[in-house]
């Protein structure tokens, strides 16, 4: 059934929003995996765990915003299978932050690709939505995680377990 509210919403944009929604859910799922790993009794880096838990919730909220947007534009939300995270074990905080940085860059590139598609299909509403809700936040997250990686290396990771402990106790907590 065709939506009565649909206007100037290209089917390619609708499909791309559904793919973006799925990617945000995958990111949330991956961050949940990281949270569970760092919260384990044999890892016990609770502030790092909380950082990933917060990011999981944030990515889930992003997915929900895409659902709401899809419905507002008269599109149809089509959920797809969410891929399992690439790992179950995340090693140390440095490895996990490097994986998180790559994930954020992947999400950012997908957002930029969606913005280009919206521009090509002359959809100023979708462009505005992406610019106001996502693009700046992605750049901030990439910078924040990049800074964490720099500081983790400065603390001697992956060789220095004390550096990882200090990072958990001070760096992640202070940046919240």
From Swiss-Prot:
UniProt xrefs under Gene3D superfamilies: 1.20.1260.10
Ligand binding (Fe cation 2): 59, 104, 138, 141
Biological role stated in the UniProt entry: Stores iron in a soluble, non-toxic, readily available form. Important for iron homeostasis. Has ferroxidase activity. Iron is taken up in the ferrous form and deposited as ferric hydroxides after oxidation.
Any one GO molecular function term: ferric iron binding
Protein name (database record): Ferritin, middle subunit
Organism expressing this protein natively: Aquarana catesbeiana
Gene Ontology, cellular component aspect: cytoplasm
Presence of the UniProt keyword rRNA-binding in the record: no
